[in-house]
């Protein structure tokens, strides 16, 4: 829940319009630059979401989801602690904002599937 609140804080402090950000990336995916290993690690962790959902559904094991959500939140914390999101320039800023936004949405969706309420701020 803390990671979701942190993402909301980034978006609010940065005055980010999520719809414009998503549209920009959809229209021009080349703006994403995964140049840092922490960016790549977070992106790869996010890409596992579909497989995690399939595992949970196949085996009826919600603990798979809770474990993966913990891993995602930990991965995001490492990313956030080491890399500036709002102070980054150009494509780096866009990439980091997109990764942050997607992390927040994915954590929220995973927790809601488990019946966990997710606050926007702590």
Label the model's feature ranges:
Residues 1-122:
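Non-catalytic interaction-recognition regions
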């Amino acid at each position: 829940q803390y990671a979701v609140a942190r993402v909301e804080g980034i978006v609010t402090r940065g005055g980010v319009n999520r719809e414009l950000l998503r549209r920009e990336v959809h229209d021009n995916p080349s703006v994403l630059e995964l140049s840092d290993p922490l960016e790549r690690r977070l992106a790869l962790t996010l890409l596992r979401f579909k497989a995690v959902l399939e595992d949970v559904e196949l085996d009826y094991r919600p603990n798979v989801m809770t474990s993966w959500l913990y891993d995602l939140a930990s991965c995001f914390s490492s990313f956030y602690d080491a890399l500036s999101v709002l102070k980054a320039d150009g494509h780096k800023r866009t990439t980091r904002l997109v990764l942050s936004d997607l992390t927040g949405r994915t954590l929220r969706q995973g927790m809601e599937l488990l019946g966990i309420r997710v606050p926007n701020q702590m």
